[in-house]
């Protein structure tokens, strides 16, 4: 093919000018610890820091890149395009550790990708001459550097490693079809033929151990996950539970095998180190195990709730029983008939159904001298052991719904389920299969809807619609999809994806869409994806053969939501639907026209001749949708697609869409097509951030105000850049736009603020120097109070200038502005002016009729009420679907208050509007997700242990109760020896020195504590001294240390934050929290309350279970001699505890930043995030991305995009 330049001009053999700069990349946890760091990396100057971080952290090759390279001569390949290998002679001059390293420049990555594609394209005659190859290379580098487009993640991971650096490895069992001979070949190298495909669909036979069977599928899946890809399978071939086996007996059923695959997937991280494995499990709606499949995740979520609750109850009650065994002397203490305290704790345990054998076990352990039970408390964090224990957490689940089933639901008809063997036998014998069970279709529909409402799964795939648009039905039906549901084709095929950044094609002066530029990009990236099929290797023989035979591609786009906002068009409008259809048609039909051009030179795909009439029928239907043809004109469709409505589409876009449709059909009729499919709409998770997209895939924006990451660290609040352009398009003046933008993001200054402004603060005693400090912090502040804290203003100013004592401004909940006499209403007004409302609703000058242009997926800010309905999402999907070969990956967000009827309506509307697949996510439908309404309902409602004891011991004889309490806590005070052992621990908590001293009994148990903070104020020091005496008296009267630990850990007040001087504890929420963490670690072995485990401090042993706790110069009993482990030694809690995990502990909690749990989650939600924490960097900047989550800080996803 002859290539022409469009974006570049020749310049000394390089692509057109791109400004480059050196940046540092650092991703940290909330506590400041490093996740990743790279310095002086070369990147395009206009890339955001987030894009730089993701490229450096995820897509740079970290090792194996030689410092010196040399070219490998190859006949017919120009020197600039030849492969490179390590130059061993030059490398020998370097120290061994300096010979290889990692990539340090974005240009290296772009060269690796573009060079590899160009090499394979030139080698197999995709270009008419060397000049065309050079143009192709330059244009691709330019598009990557300017963020116009990006390939899927496996391309970034794998493509070009062998071509650019000579990196190789042992073959992993892959296959490829030799393009020269067309013969299947087993790979001998891991990287010579890369694995660039992200999406796979695999089949599974009803066979346990043979090739193509169940256990073989897990091996094939593992091979895919290792190289960063995702896979989907329809498991309907597997027999249902109790279905007869050929050799006698009954089948264990589909679900038993799905649980094996789920476990295998959970053990593998995709791409080696970056993401969890991603997989899709599909099941036909007539499978005999369909009900169990629908309920799978609902049931497993219930198990998580049970595990979490049960672990906490067991821990509390079993340790209470253990403690009761030490409240008196002699053998009678183990007899509940003679030890009233033991009897009471056993009764309490039995009330909450603690197993009898565990109660007996604890008493037996107490007889043997054990004094504590280590029973791990599980949490609802999605990465916790509770979720790791249950099944179904490593796949997206979808049900294949036929038109027959949907009609049965509509008409309230019965629905038959069939044993697999019976269905197959009936097909062979040419008769109607006998059902194994008959249900009401609506009952099954109710189950599907409830499960999606309760657990966000299953999604739906509309089997009949999918197959009516199938280009190759002669080779079998489409049975499944990839994990994100955008790739839908034959079993044992693969698709590699790429997405265009639509925002780059909007002229920000004229606000017109650059049709020619977009067409050019679509053409080049169709060629790239086709070349990628030629160079690829695959995880099995079948996939290699069928992917070569059908050559499916997955070109798509991102940033549609931003484009619509820039053009001043509401996402939920007829105009948006028409423009979406036009853009999709231009992309889709340009890709097919390019495919036909390649077919002219390379020949059509192998399976084309057999399927020619079907494929041309599908292309004609695509063209009819571009012309908005009436329903009677379509061929072979039961549901009429949504065509491009000419009344709402700009004429130039409509003309282009129809021209491209005409061209694709005419070229296809003449030459055939090189590819069976060409387009999908992927979620563009990580690659969307690399392209600095505001919105991913076909999604709308999630918020109007963003927090831009700064190169030097920190964040800067900005308005979504689509907003000013959208306002301009709507006719607002520059001054009106400025006012609206400032209303949203804030003025970032006190000048002009209502009530709390520069003048008012000067009258309160603020100096010009201090006001400058406040002003400098306002652009970074999310709330005005953050600018008025002691760290920003300085303690000296607060005490000397404002006359506020340290005791006052150090007190919990202290607000300087309120202390100065400003009301909460004053503060809110000033906060809205300075920091913004984060919503456009009620903005000055903005007409209410223009509100819909700026509607987002979620409510914006704390005042926002508007958000896009589920119907609007479905309508946009319906507008794009007629111009997409595959499907659209999208999860529709529903608010927490959505009801099951909404789920039913959304899934039903999706079918009626000819969407191929859909998934819904109701806010809070996962137990692991923090939810505002739950937090607000339960905030402040904590369990008072003493009140609980009082209520539990209530009876008709109050005098008797009083006697028991006196007997228990007063009559048996245990005196400490006059000379006692103990230890002194010095630490600094939040910048304040703390000395903790302990006193011990002869047996090593703690009996007293002393707390010294001698530089603090007299009142605070005296309170701490009184507190220490109170605790000491309690310890001497038999109050177990663990009770204090449970009561006071996670207690929050200042000083708090970073802890230095303690080898196990690095972060605390208060001095009291620190003290009881330290005591728990030393005397109870509770290393889960520290951030550094003992094994992290030992260099020569791994996880010794008999680790010795050390005292001040005195060795204590080994842990195992006084602590019983009911379960294996508890897994240490990670330093960054998720919000759901913190809630589950039923203690006042805070984030490492010191902000309360409720406030932190509220802030995340107000900013438009979900409230979940990122598993990679710990930030709370997670947004929903297709059916997964994506971190806006580091780019990690919980799926395959």
Swiss-Prot record:
Report keywords, A-Z.
Cobalamin, Cobalt, Disulfide bond, DNA synthesis, Nucleotide-binding, Oxidoreductase
Question: Which InterPro entries does this chain map to?
Answer: RdRp_reductase_class-2, RNR_2_N, RNR_lg_C, RNR_NrdJ/NrdZ, TSCPD_dom, YebC-like
Q: Which cysteines are joined by disulfide bonds?
A: 199-495
- Which EC number(s) are documented for this chain? 1.17.4.1
Organism of origin: Leptospira interrogans serogroup Icterohaemorrhagiae serovar Lai (strain 56601)
Residues involved in substrate binding: 153, 198-199, 230, 482-486, 683-687
Keyword Oxidoreductase among record annotations: yes
**Feature: compositional bias, Basic and acidic residues:** 1100-1118
PANTHER family reported for this sequence: RIBONUCLEOSIDE-DIPHOSPHATE REDUCTASE, VITAMIN B12-DEPENDENT RIBONUCLEOTIDE REDUCTASE
Physiological role = Catalyzes the reduction of ribonucleotides to deoxyribonucleotides. May function to provide a pool of deoxyribonucleotide precursors for DNA repair during oxygen limitation and/or for immediate growth after restoration of oxygen.
Chain positions covered by the region annotation Disordered? 1100-1120
Biological process terms in GO annotation: DNA biosynthetic process
Active site located where? 482, 484, 486
Give the family, as the similarity comment puts it. Answer: Belongs to the ribonucleoside diphosphate reductase class-2 family.
What the entry lists under SUPFAM superfamilies is as follows: PFL-like glycyl radical enzymes, YebC-like
One GO term in the molecular function aspect is: cobalamin binding
The name under which this protein is listed is Vitamin B12-dependent ribonucleotide reductase
Q: Which cofactor does it need?
A: adenosylcob(III)alamin
Catalyses:
a 2'-deoxyribonucleoside 5'-diphosphate + [thioredoxin]-disulfide + H2O = a ribonucleoside 5'-diphosphate + [thioredoxin]-dithiol
Note how many cofactor molecules are bound and how: 5'-deoxyadenosylcobalamine (coenzyme B12).
Q: Does the keyword Nucleotide-binding apply?
A: yes
